[in-house]
Amino acid sequence: MILNSSTEDGIKRIQDDCPKAGRHNYIFVMIPTLYSIIFVVGIFGNSLVVIVIYFYMKLKTVASVFLLNLALADLCFLLTLPLWAVYTAMEYRWPFGNYLCKIASASVSFNLYASVFLLTCLSIDRYVAIVHPMKSPVRRTMLMAKVTCIIIWLLAGLASLPTIIHRNVFFIENTNITVCAFHYESQNSTLPIGLGLTKNILGFLFPFLIILTSYTLIWKTLKRAYEIQKNKPRNDDIFKIIMAIVLFFFFSWVPHQIFTFLDVLIQLGIIHDCKIADIVDTAMPITICIAYFNNCLNPLFYGFLGKKFKKYFLQLLKYIPPKAKSHSSLSTKMSTLSYRPSDHGNASTKKSASCVEVE
């Protein structure tokens, strides 16, 4: 992911056509302030999530493995955020050298893909647990979860390779600044366009469709369960949680993805207007703040859907140490729903809807 489109994907545009795109005094004040807030809140929140899941919950469930990795991925990104805050406050002047430029840039890209992939796997895990509970013990194992996380980290690293290779520190003559930006040997390189479209498709569109499909099927399964168990009161909170999960992901990322796509159109020469380029480059860091602030809250958001997570989180805040006895799972807000569609079939079918949150 890119923290400032005006100094990287749009580098050719800055040098030639629109040198002042995205360069406003209020941006140089507001964005570093927002980055600082995200850094403090994110480091504090995600560190507590890691402590609660690993030391209090004892990392006993598939969902907890995904949440732990989600928090760790966020922490890796957050550690580089002060660099970007200083970079923006200095009006996009990079004082930290080439190695930190590559490392910090790769961390941003890595976090985008790792977080989105982990959230997608978490939705698939919920789908298997609720829609196919009989197959769940076979498919949802701790080993499978850990292997999946390793694969996700490798894929995120692979997706970040272009950033490591092409992101460098160099001097822009007409603006007289040293930037940390994508630098291509040829100004006609199609790589920035490819990276932008990859971010749109692989970093948002496909994962969102999977998440939407998973929770839609979960919704239908739970609704059918409630219809069969008419004697039990319906808990609408479950459906509100499902809606919140899907909408939270969508509205966190769609603004940034829209402006990333507009930036691709500018790269392709479809959009020529410098006013539009200025709007895109000005809005880009703002949409990034929205995406990454929500992204860093994801572990807390998903974790707090479980009752035991909330219990242990409060214990940690009160300096109550974890008990020696391990806890088998994150408790759920949703009670188990069991029903038999027919008493006259070849075999009784039993389904259990486990938690939408974390199990």
Curated annotation (Swiss-Prot):
InterPro entries: ATII_AT1_rcpt, ATII_rcpt, CCR1-9-like, GPCR_Rhodpsn, GPCR_Rhodpsn_7TM. PANTHER family: CELL ADHESION MOLECULE, TYPE-1 ANGIOTENSIN II RECEPTOR A. This is Type-1 angiotensin II receptor. GO terms for cellular component: plasma membrane. Residues 1-25, 90-98, 166-190, 269-278 are extracellular. Disulfide bonds join C18-C274, C101-C180. Signal peptide: none annotated. It is a multi-pass membrane protein. Residues 335-352 have a biased composition (Polar residues).
